[in-house]
């Protein structure tokens, strides 16, 4: 009622707006906001608690304290609404205007705004082209600045010290103006003529040659352009009027005992007003200059503190020595306005409690304590009580509820029926952390949770708590039921596999009932149907694990929904037959006729979802759970100390290993191996031993000898409880059992390096003191890591969400033909990820043909590949498929459904409006806590087993070489002379089954295309030495070999052979630094030979530490080893693993010593070395050269005369993503990022779909750098959104003008988030001050396109169900095309958009 009467007096309400603009406020604007000037620093009268007149809480300025009542009490009541009391000056209106009415302070002297002064780059400094130090000297009265030189030789903006100023005054009298303080800066800014300055700068840019100058000029041009375009004036960066925040936003609350609690802002404002008034008085009194100056400086400092305390000098502190919270602190940081109150708010109608198991619940239910439900649904209960006539008023209803009368509970039951509630468990790392359930009222005080959703919530019942929220509106209930119900979220959005999968007890029960054992009671019986089996089992005629034959009726459901059934007799076990009773109709029994390990159960649920759909699967999952619990109870599996069987072979294996270690120790003492080699070998031996013992132990625990029905003794999988648990995937893993019953093995120190003495005991035998001490090292590090990891992982997720938050599906098809080429991932002998898994759920970009048949495509363009299509591709043994990808999507905002493909959580093509960016960020961030924190050291056993020295193929097939260069050795085998060579094994269909890297110098025993058998060795090499291989036959000639200077003669004690080692140039004398030991190969007459097919001499530069075993003049054949470089010499480089690695990749950080890639294709040669660098020259086909200086310590992995292609590695190391983008382009970069990130996750056994990484990569690539501005409005070197450039270029081409040329730029996720078009989104992420300063200067408008901006301004997000709302809003506002164009700043599209894409098309 009150608000209704207030209709006429409402403050300007802005409900409907399309964009928000931020700009500098002019003094006039500030005055127009203000309701009066605050003249006194007083707040409220301590006796009457009434605000003082003209003070910081003045009622005349800001409005009345009580609704419709003036301060002195002359006017009370509604009838005087709008009257201004003549006695106290208060307007009679609502008290809440005190939250919105502002005041102002007229400053006696101008004050520079600290944000525009100190926030780097300093805007005032750029504008005036002065350094920040100089401006500060002027502002804080340490120097004069010339504001108007007149006819004097002084320069404008020249700084003068006190002495210089006085001298100048004497010399030129009043011919020039100079001043100090903010007035001077204000004057300088006011007199800038932006337009002419702009013209002058453009001319200067054209004429200048220096890089640094160009950068500075470009920056200034951009700033001045921004001022011109936004209509801001430069002098507004210096304030003459200060706005005062409404008093209710900086409250002053009386506490008991006559003290007050106040907002820090009041203190800061008080200081400003005090100093301002004092300055005014001093000016009126014509006080001496020095006093006035000091007061002005203090005023400047107090305004600085009010705006951003602590930005300059020491922060002003309050009574408790704590810095006061300034206006800037109010909005930034986790506790600031953006993150604390706008992006996340506390809500009503919510409660939290501990969770317990609800094993009897259905999947869509949760147990809600009655007490809690009553409190949450109170208003609903009140309403119903009134409607039933059980209570006449709300008050009466309240009494009934408080007394908890019987009828209240009945009514609560009705209210709750089919009203879903949301359950949330913190931390909510992905969208499955909030799901909807139908509540079931229960006694007790704990919420009951269905066991199958625990995986999604990552919940366990050791004291976890969950929060309950009630969706109130009908729409909210609808969304909760249709989108968030636990039964609608069976698949994980990260990888499309079921997430409602039984674990632990349930798996154990299902595994136990589906195991087959030999010679059990009833083996060999034949049953007519499953119910007969059940009868037999209940009557104890057969045992659960007995192998029997059963007639099973099988129903097949075809794609059209047609059903056909048939019966067959199946070999199975009693348990599996019982399991078949709960299988839904249409699910093939053979899926369940196996051991039900966790993997198999997951496969079962997945198949059920794909074949039969959602409803059947949900019912099935529930049945599986009930059955699992029932049989786990029956099995009564538990572990005891006797289950940990220690293998008998352990002793022998350990003795062997100890002998080996002793031998290496002796070799080390006699100087045959270096300390590093000894350590590596010892660690290698122990990790091998640990593996052997583990294998022996698994054999001991996992098998047992039994008699079968025929009386023969055979091995079968044992029913050892420990083994059952690990084998089924219920709990524990081989690694853990190995510690219980094998040997604990090697331990790591906190820095990740490995202690070379292993722990030989296991927990069953017990550790001695030293072993225990060694193991505490790593364990403590583990705990410290976990704490750090959680925080880091959360921060990574936050950055990912921020960079991708505005990626939404906006249209069906963008029409691009681009895409990524997908091939299976093969590492070593294993196909890590087959093609079918990589392309499942993607859309084909180009028709796919059978290998070697170009007539009839198997799959046509724009087909969404589902399970059936993928199987077809596999049958046709297709090796690579080009699929659409978000990286190449051409939609102007968001991405299109075709480029994204299947919605992983639903299994069909993604819907328009799906917020795929946030889903991608959550999918990558959520497993972050499972990744390790530590960096692995290569050369330790933890990283992998012993060094590989040969290739033994695992499958039968044919050999194929990939970009391998080789020479034929006299012995008939080939020797590899390229570094990037690879050997693959293809099966009969030409599909790649294995792929191996062939190192330089490897001897290859098979030829290209040869047939090989499984187990055959096809290549071998020396892993500890890097050879240098001769590519021609001839005689050796040494060059620059000076004994004792460049080479040292060594004689091997054992063999007596002499060898020469090249010395390190650093250790040589000055005159020998230039000598370069080379082995050249000459013919019998001594003429230089050349490398075949080139005109380069056959000579090999020997790096330091290399060893030559041949004598000068010795004969060599093709493929012979001329020299070798001990591999131990190459430093073991750390590889970063886990979370830090993922963060580095997403932040696009350059690695420490990045690999150097060839800048162009051509032939390698080496030029003259400089002091610490070697000169590498690449000469391309047309004879132009590119040279690169490379530090001496880096390993160059190419040789003189070798041909390299652009982007190939020439110096070993981790490639930098920026180089890949620059030299190879976007697709290889995407492939590299996806591969590297997936490697980290795969190591932890986490599955993430490539799509998600691609979505993030797309966001990292959204900016481009202008290389040639053409006739566009951009400047060279400027970074612009790709979309902006494309639009601008389209406009220019239409007018037949020169479009701008650009290169893609890779930004890290933090940089990319801060560089988004929306300043609201960027400001709420990080560096709030910098973002807002930048935006204000540019007069940026935020079109509220992303999700975050809309949440902040309090609207529905433009995604999901909100997409239609936004489209409707735009239609309702009835904007014409041209108006739309002015709003969005881009041309309105003329051609009609497809009806389906309508919602998206309006999403400009």
Swiss-Prot record:
Chemical reaction(s) catalysed: RNA(n) + a ribonucleoside 5'-triphosphate = RNA(n+1) + diphosphate
EC number annotated for this UniProt entry: 2.7.7.6
Keyword annotations of the record: DNA-directed RNA polymerase, Magnesium, Metal-binding, Nucleotidyltransferase, Transcription, Transferase, Zinc
CDD domains: RNAP_beta'_C, RNAP_beta'_N
Keyword Lyase: no
Note on cofactor: Binds 1 Mg(2+) ion per subunit. Binds 2 Zn(2+) ions per subunit.
Keyword Nucleotidyltransferase carried by entry: yes
A Pfam family it matches: RNA_pol_Rpb1_1
List of residues binding Zn(2+) 1: 70, 72, 85, 88
GO biological process, alphabetically ordered: DNA-templated transcription
Chain residues that bind Mg(2+): 460, 462, 464
Cofactor field: Mg(2+); Zn(2+)
Sequence positions that bind Zn(2+) 2: 814, 889, 896, 899
Matches recorded under InterPro entries: DNA-dir_RpoC_beta_prime, DNA-dir_RpoC_beta_prime_bact, RNA_pol_asu, RNA_pol_N, RNA_pol_Rpb1_1, RNA_pol_Rpb1_3, RNA_pol_Rpb1_3_sf, RNA_pol_Rpb1_4
GO-annotated molecular function: DNA binding; DNA-directed RNA polymerase activity; magnesium ion binding; zinc ion binding
GO cellular component: DNA-directed RNA polymerase complex
Subunit structure: The RNAP catalytic core consists of 2 alpha, 1 beta, 1 beta' and 1 omega subunit. When a sigma factor is associated with the core the holoenzyme is formed, which can initiate transcription.
Annotated family: Belongs to the RNA polymerase beta' chain family.
Function: DNA-dependent RNA polymerase catalyzes the transcription of DNA into RNA using the four ribonucleoside triphosphates as substrates.
Protein name (database record): DNA-directed RNA polymerase subunit beta'
Organism per entry: Xanthomonas axonopodis pv. citri (strain 306)
């Amino acid at each position: 009622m009150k608000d209704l009467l207030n209709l006429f007096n409402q403050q300007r309400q802005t409900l409907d707006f399309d964009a928000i603009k931020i700009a500098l406020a002019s003094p006039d604007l500030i005055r127009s906001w203000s309701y009066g000037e605050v003249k006194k620093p007083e707040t409220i009268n301590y006796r009457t608690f009434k605000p003082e007149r003209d003070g910081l809480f003045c009622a005349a300025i800001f409005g009345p304290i009580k609704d419709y009542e003036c301060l002195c009490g002359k006017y009370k009541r509604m009838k005087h609404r709008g009257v201004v009391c003549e006695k106290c000056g208060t307007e009679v209106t609502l008290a809440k205007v005190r939250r919105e009415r502002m005041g102002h302070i007229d400053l006696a002297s101008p004050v520079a705004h600290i944000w525009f002064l100190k926030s780097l780059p300093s805007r005032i400094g750029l504008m005036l082209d002065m350094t920040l130090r100089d401006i500060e000297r002027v502002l804080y009265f340490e120097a004069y600045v010339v504001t108007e030189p007149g006819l004097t030789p002084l320069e404008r903006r020249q700084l003068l010290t006190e002495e210089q100023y006085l001298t100048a005054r004497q010399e030129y009298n009043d011919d020039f103006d100079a001043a100090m303080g903010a007035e001077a800066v204000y004057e300088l800014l006011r007199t800038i003529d932006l337009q002419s300055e702009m013209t002058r700068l453009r001319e200067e840019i054209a004429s200048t040659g220096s890089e640094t100058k160009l950068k500075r000029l470009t920056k200034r041009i951009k700033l001045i352009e921004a001022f011109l375009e936004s209509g801001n004036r430069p002098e507004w960066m210096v304030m003459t009027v200060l706005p005062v925040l409404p008093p209710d936003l900086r409250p002053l609350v009386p506490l008991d005992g006559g003290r007050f609690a106040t907002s820090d802002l009041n203190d800061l404002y008080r200081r400003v007003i005090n100093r301002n008034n004092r300055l005014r008085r001093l000016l009126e009194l014509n006080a001496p200059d020095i006093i006035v100056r000091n007061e002005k400086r203090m005023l400047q400092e107090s305004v600085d503190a009010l705006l951003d305390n602590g930005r300059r000098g020491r922060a002003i502190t309050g009574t408790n020595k704590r810095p006061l919270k300034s206006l800037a602190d109010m909005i930034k940081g986790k506790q600031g306005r953006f993150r604390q109150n706008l992006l996340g708010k506390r809500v009503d109608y919510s409660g939290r409690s501990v969770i317990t198991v609800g094993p009897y619940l259905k999947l869509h239910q949760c147990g809600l304590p009655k007490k809690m439900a009553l409190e949450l649904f109170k208003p609903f209960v009140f309403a119903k009580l009134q409607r039933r006539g059980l209570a006449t008023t709300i008050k009466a209803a309240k009494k009934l509820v408080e007394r908890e009368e019987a009828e209240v509970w009945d009514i609560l039951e009705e209210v709750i029926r089919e009203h879903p509630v949301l359950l949330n468990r913190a931390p909510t790392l992905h969208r499955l952390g909030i799901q909807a359930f139908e509540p079931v009222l229960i006694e007790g005080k704990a919420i009951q949770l269905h066991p199958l959703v625990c995986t999604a919530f990552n919940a366990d019942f050791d004291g976890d708590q969950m929060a309950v929220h009630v969706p109130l509106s009908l729409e909210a209930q609808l969304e909760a039921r249709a989108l968030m119900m636990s039964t609608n979220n069976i698949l994980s959005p990260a990888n499309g596999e079921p997430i409602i999968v039984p674990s632990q007890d349930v798996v154990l029960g299902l595994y136990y009932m589906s195991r087959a054992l030999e010679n059990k009671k009833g083996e060999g019986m034949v049953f007519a149907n499953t119910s007969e089996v059940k009868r037999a089992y209940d009557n104890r005629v057969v045992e659960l694990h007995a192998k029997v034959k059963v007639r099973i009726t099988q129903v097949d459901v075809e794609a059209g929904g047609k059903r056909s059934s048939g019966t067959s007799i199946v070999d199975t076990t009693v348990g599996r037959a019982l399991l078949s009773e709960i299988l839904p109709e249409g699910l093939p029994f053979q899926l369940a006729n196996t051991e039900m390990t966790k993997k198999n159960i997951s496969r079962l649920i997945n198949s059920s979802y794909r074949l039969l759909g959602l409803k059947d699967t949900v019912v099935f999952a529930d049945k599986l759970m009930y059955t699992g619990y029932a049989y786990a109870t029956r099995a009564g599996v538990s572990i005891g100390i006797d289950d940990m069987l220690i293998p008998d072979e352990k002793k022998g294996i350990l003795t062997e290993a100890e002998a080996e270690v002793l031998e290496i120790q002796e070799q080390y003492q006699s100087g045959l191996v270096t300390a590093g080699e000894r350590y590596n070998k010892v660690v290698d031996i122990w990790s091998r031993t640990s593996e052997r013992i583990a294998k022996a132990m698994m054999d001991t625990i996992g098998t047992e000898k039994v008699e079968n029905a025929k009386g023969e003794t055979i091995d079968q999988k044992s029913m050892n409880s420990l083994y059952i648990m690990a084998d089924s995937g219920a709990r524990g893993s081989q690694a853990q059992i190995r510690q219980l019953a094998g040997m604990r093995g090697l331990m790591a120190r906190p820095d990740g390096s490995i202690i070379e003495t292993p722990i030989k005991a296991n927990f069953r035998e017990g550790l001695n003191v030293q072993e225990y001490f060694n193991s505490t090292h790593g364990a403590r590090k583990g705990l410290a890591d976990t704490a750090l990891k959680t925080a880091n992982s959360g921060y990574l997720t936050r950055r990912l969400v921020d960079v991708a938050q505005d990626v939404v599906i906006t249209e069906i098809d963008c029409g691009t033909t681009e895409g990524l080429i997908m091939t299976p991932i093969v590492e070593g002998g294993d196909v890590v990820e087959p093609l079918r898994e990589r392309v499942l759920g993607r859309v084909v970009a180009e028709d796919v043909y059978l290998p070697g048949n170009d007539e009839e495509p198997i799959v046509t363009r724009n087909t969404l590949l589902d399970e059936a299509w993928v199987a077809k591709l596999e049958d046709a043994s297709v090796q690579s498929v080009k699929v659409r990808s978000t990286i190449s999507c051409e939609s102007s905002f968001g991405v299109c459904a075709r480029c994204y493909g299947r919605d992983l959580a639903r299994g069909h093509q993604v819907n328009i409006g799906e917020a795929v960016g946030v889903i991608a960020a959550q999918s990558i961030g959520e497993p972050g806590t499972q990744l390790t924190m530590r960096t692995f050291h290569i050369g330790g056993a933890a990283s992998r087993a012993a060094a590989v020295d040969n290739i033994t193929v695992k499958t039968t097939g044919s050999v194929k070489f990939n970009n391998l260069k080789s020479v034929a050795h006299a012995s008939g085998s080939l020797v590899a002379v390229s570094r990037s060579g690879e050997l693959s094994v293809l099966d009969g269909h030409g599909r790649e089954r294995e792929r191996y890297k062939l190192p330089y110098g490897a001897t290859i025993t098979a030829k290209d295309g040869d047939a090989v058998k499984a187990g055959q060795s096809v290549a071998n090499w020396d892993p500890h030495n890097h050879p240098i291989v001769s590519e021609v036959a001839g005689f050796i000639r040494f060059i620059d070999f000076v004994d004792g200077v460049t080479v040292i003669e060594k004689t091997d004690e054992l063999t007596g052979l002499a060898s020469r080692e090249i010395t390190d140039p650093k250790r040589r004398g000055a005159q020998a630094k230039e000598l370069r030991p080379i082995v050249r190969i000459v013919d019998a007459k001594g003429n230089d030979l050349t490398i075949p097919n080139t005109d380069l001499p056959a000579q090999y530069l020997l790096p330091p530490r290399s060893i030559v075993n041949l004598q000068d003049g010795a004969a060599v054949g093709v493929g012979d080893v001329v020299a070798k470089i001990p591999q131990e010499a190459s430093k073991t480089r750390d590889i970063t693993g886990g979370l830090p690695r993922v963060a580095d990749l997403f932040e696009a950080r350059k690695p420490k010593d990045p690999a150097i890639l060839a800048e162009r294709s051509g032939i390698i040669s080496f030029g003259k070395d400089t002091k610490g660098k070697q000169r590498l020259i690449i000469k391309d086909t047309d004879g132009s050269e590119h040279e690169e200086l490379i530090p001496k310590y880096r390993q160059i992995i190419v040789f003189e005369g070798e041909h390299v292609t652009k982007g190939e590695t020439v110096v070993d190391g981790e490639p930098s993503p920026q180089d890949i983008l620059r030299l190879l382009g976007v697709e290889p970069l995407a492939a590299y990022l996806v591969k590297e990130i997936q490697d980290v996750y795969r190591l932890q056994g986490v599955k993430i779909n490539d799509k998600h990484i691609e979505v993030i990569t797309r966001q990292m690539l959204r900016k481009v750098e202008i290389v040639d501005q053409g006739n566009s409005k951009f400047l060279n070197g400027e970074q612009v959104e790709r979309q902006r450039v494309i639009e601008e270029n389209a406009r220019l081409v239409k007018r037949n003008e020169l479009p701008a040329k650009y290169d893609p730029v890779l930004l890290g996720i933090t940089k990319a988030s801060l560089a988004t078009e929306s300043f609201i989104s960027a400001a709420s992420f990080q560096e709030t001050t910098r973002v807002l300063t930048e935006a204000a200067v540019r007069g940026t408008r935020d079109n509220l396109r992303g999700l975050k901006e809309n949440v902040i301004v309090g609207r529905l997000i433009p995604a999901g169900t909100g997409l239609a709302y936004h489209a409707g809003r735009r239609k309702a506002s009835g904007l014409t095309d041209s108006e739309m164009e002015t709003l969005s700043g881009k041309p309105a599209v003329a051609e009609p958009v497809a009806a389906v894409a309508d919602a998206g098309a309006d999403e400009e």
